[in-house]
Amino acid sequence: MQKKLTGKCWIFILVCLCLSGCFYAGASSRSVSVVTWNVQTFFDANTSGSEYSDFIRSKQWGVQAYEARLKRLCEVMRQLDADIYVFEEIENKDILIDISNELSGFSWNQRKNWNYALFAKNESGAIGCAVLSRFPLSEPTVHNLDVRTEREKQPELRPVIRLKVLVNDTQLVLFVNHWKSKSGGAEKTEVWRNWQESLLSSLMKKDFERGAYILAAGDFNRDISEFNFCGDCNDDSGIVVLGGEVPVYSPWFFGGVLEEPGSYYYNDSWERIDHFFASQNIAFLEFRAATGVWCEDSGIPARYKIYTGQGYSDHLPLFCRICLDEVNTECS
């Protein structure tokens, strides 16, 4: 089999988004909170031609609708108050600048602002992934697949993004993922998610072998039950073996039981397709699929509806607080 890292990508890193100063969270703790959230086709109000057709055709979509949606996203960010946000389905870097401008006036403490940001997507892609952080970001790399050994042509696949986050004096290696959807059939498209898993595991293995603190986050479009688990572990251990060689922990088993209900609601059924996967030298202090005003009364995600301008996303945000210390002696 052949695997190449190739393709043209846009990668953009912003440092000190707020003009009034650049600080990072300065406590000595190794504790850090992270949210990963698929924000559901988050386009801006400018038409570049790569947008999905329902946004291009819609008479309801424009500056006013975009600004209203942006405000709601920022309200969720303030409410969850995570140190790091990993977003899937962001159109471009300009949205990160708009987020920063929207948030900059709400905190007198610059250490509480998200002064660091990154955006990346393939040149031909409509949407990409973004990171906003209170901690400095560095050394971003984008990794694509070029598979030519399958019977069918490789579809458009989003890249894996690797970057480093300096959490006070401790380095966290963060991998951002948005894997192939099941559109076109779960079984038929599984081969491409397998390839993406192989790519991620090969990248993680290098950091794993040097004892780094590693966290993979994103929308994997694969339920936790569909991953391969450690054969010698208890069923509720939460130890997933990525690519058959990299053992990582899934907090969907936080507390020793499978967390309910899930993060994505489709065809009247909950799924757990959004994930954190962590090296085992990281301790999880909290984990949840966060609920709030971004949910319907029933608790399911309030998906964004372009024809009404209402809603948030068809996914729930996943929240975790982790300690970059496996015995949890360095976290408050």
Where do the model's predicted regions map?
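Catalytic metal-binding/acid-base residues of hydrolase active sites
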Residues: 40, 90-91, 178-180, 220-223
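Metal-dependent phosphoester-hydrolase catalytic domains
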Residues: 23, 155, 202-215, 221-332
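N-terminal, active-site-proximal structural segment of metallo-dependent hydrolase catalytic domains
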Residues: 22-106, 121-122, 324-331
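Beta-strand-turn-beta hairpins that frame and shape the catalytic cleft
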Residues: 28-34, 43, 155-181, 324-327
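Bacterial N-terminal signal peptides
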Residues: 11-21
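Metal-dependent phosphoester/phosphodiester hydrolase catalytic core
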Residues: 167-197, 202, 207
